[in-house]
Amino acid sequence: QAEPVSVAITVEMNGKDLGQRVRTFSVRSINECLLGYVANGTKFHDTSIFFAAYVNEENPMIDQLLREALNTRIVNRFLGYQSKAKGAVDKQVYALWNILQKRKFRYSSVSNTSLSSNVVFSQRVRTFDDALESSQINCVDGSVLFASLLRAINIDPILVRTPGHMFVGYYTDNSHTNKNFLETTMIGDVDLDDFFPDEQLDSTMVGKSQNEMSLLTFEKSKQYANKKYKENEEGIHSGKLNYMFLEISK
């Protein structure tokens, strides 16, 4: 909830009181990310770079999550870009995906905020702690959560925004030559047929173990997000409104 705060300013010059003015401002929740604002009635200033503020690799909960990921034995340690083995980075990323799936996240489309107006635009974003405690994420929550974990293991993440959607990417090498993308809403309990209607994937899930299903959704998440990136690549790198390619390492 927004709370009003009054600010009083008193001016004096050469010992003479020049008067006082009082302005009332609204203090908003840290969960409200400012997307942009309109100045002078016409010019829009994009502030979506503020999404980066929700990427928090220093969160105390991360150590516990990384320990859970190591306990899966998918990887023995997190080396970031140090390993030269083929697929080493993707394997580390999958270990993170796997443990988040075990926490049974659910997709939640809640993104409304009391701040948005025809002058100031914002979106509600769950903090790292909020997302873990509620086990609910939307596309933005999932992207900044996953980016936080990637940063914690020294893999450089990317936040990608298209109109009405966000997904996360990561560089697969230290030189930033190659990259992959993930559709984080697929971490939750989803119907794969919604993403791949022509493949009837849900029927192939019958009888598979939890880890087999987790790996399948991880690979399909990459496939889906990489396709979306290619379809929107021109806009993503154009600097146009509602598009964003934000490298968190920079």
Residue map of PLM features:
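A structural boundary/capping signal
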Residues: 1-250
